[in-house]
Swiss-Prot record:
It is found in: Endosome; Prevacuolar compartment. Plays an important role in membrane trafficking through the secretory apparatus. In complex with MON1, acts as a guanine exchange factor (GEF) for RABG3F of the Rab7 protein family. Promotes the exchange of GDP to GTP, converting RABG3F from an inactive GDP-bound form into an active GTP-bound form. The RABG3F active form is involved in protein trafficking from prevacuolar compartments (PVCs) to vacuoles. May serve as a linker between Rab5 and Rab7 protein families in PVCs and mediate PVC maturation. The keyword Chloroplast does not apply. This is Vacuolar fusion protein CCZ1 homolog A. It holds the Pfam family Intu_longin_1. GO terms for biological process: vesicle-mediated transport. One of its GO terms (cellular component) is Mon1-Ccz1 complex. The keyword ATP-binding does not apply. Transmembrane segments: none annotated. The gene is CCZ1A. PANTHER family: VACUOLAR FUSION PROTEIN CCZ1 HOMOLOG A, VACUOLAR FUSION PROTEIN CCZ1 HOMOLOG-RELATED. Keywords: Endosome, Guanine-nucleotide releasing factor. It comes from Arabidopsis thaliana (Mouse-ear cress).
Amino acid sequence: MASMSSGDESLRLCMFDLRRGQTEGQELEKILFFYPADLDFSTQLSVIGLSEGLITFTRLFSPEAACEVIEAERHSHVFYEAEPDIWMVMVVEKNKETGAIWRIDALRRVLKEVHSLFVMFHGSIRALIEKEPTGGLTRSLLYPFITDYLSTFQIWSLSEDCCCEFFVGKKLQLPTFRETLRERGTVQMLTLARDTAVEVQSLVQVLDSCAGSLRCHSMILFQDLLVSTTLSADDTVDLFTFAVMRLTSKALSSDTSSWSYLRKGPGSSEISSRSNLAPVGSIDSLHSRNGNNMHHVIRPLQNDKWTKGKDGFLITDIWGLETGGSPDSAIPTIWLQQTQERMYLLAYQHKSLTLLLLMPTNAIVNGDLSISAVKQQVIEDASLRILKIEENISRGWGGENAYHIKGYRYLVVDNDTKVSRSSPSGKVTTLAKESLLALNKLREEVDSEKSRAKGQEKDMEICIRAKNNVWVIARVTRGKELYMALEKGSDTLLDTTDAVGRFSNRYCSGAFLMD
């Protein structure tokens, strides 16, 4: 991870609405979020004005696909149109001396992830703006949400076996070439034995029946791996990402080697406390000082806010309790992309197994269902099955190196199901820096080809021998991607091709065999 100071020009992150602030004197209205928030308005408008100009200019030549990235001498400008006319832009400083070498698509995936998580909890940004046209409500939700995401979202470090955060002190950690064998925006699946898979399917049916005739959804995780889901691929990725951040046994355990516990420096606490307030540099901070911005802001990504209750269900006070409301008003809720339904989220945990159960909120409001009744049904009907499945999986689990394949350092991505599998982080660290840089550059070439193809599937096969004699390989076919580094210097191109073929046959059902 490359460290970027929050006090200099190394990073700017903003979100703005092209439909707002087009009248002279009202330019500030277009700003929905800006990091660092304490920059003066003129600097914020300068960054957004340049970004807006680049978007407008590139649309002249490519109306259907506007600006994705602009490479300047000192900075990279990464663009992501989160919703129609609502843009997120990340401006990062180039600095090879600090290891700030990244893949643009990896940075764009950070923007996409934070937007997807925000929508899962709060709904679309455009809908919020239409609900409250001044933009005050939208900003009051965006500022703490993105700040919490940046300051506490945990990523498995490739340099050591522990969690690191985007913020370490006042340094912002961005994904670099060292994470090139990882794919944000995908889930990692657990491979099950046949008998265990049958038991899991039976458990899913039991969970579905706990709400009677109502259509529910469920997700099951073992540690940080997905076991089962009844959600769409997009909804699965969003909920899986949140679960790994805050709900799994690893996320809840205070004795794991997480930097959020080991690094309680002033920077971390400063960011946490600051995100409770309207940022000094935001246009809503003026109103908040006068007491006009006092509504309760839900901050789902706050750290250390979930605990396990005596009945096995996870509890949190993030959603609070509405005055005069029912206890159900404190239950977490999320939006599903596929059905546009608002769902209650219940989380149950037994050792390393975490179950997530989603139920439509309108059923609770209408009195068709009660949360307490569903919880009791889960305990009565599913607890023994859960215990047995957790025991079986734990007994057969190979640990953190379960998916290590001797001689290979790899990443496999299925874009249709949004599932990925890769070499364990500890094994990736054995690659030389030159190997990772070569692989990162190869992935950039594939990203460029995919961008030029404009969504059309295109088979690709690239095999390059780098200066340190490492072979880096990319194969893309039928929505699936394989990236690999082979550091056996004596291998010829034919040896390398055969090695990739053996890998494809044994571990990918022959998906990457090329004619």
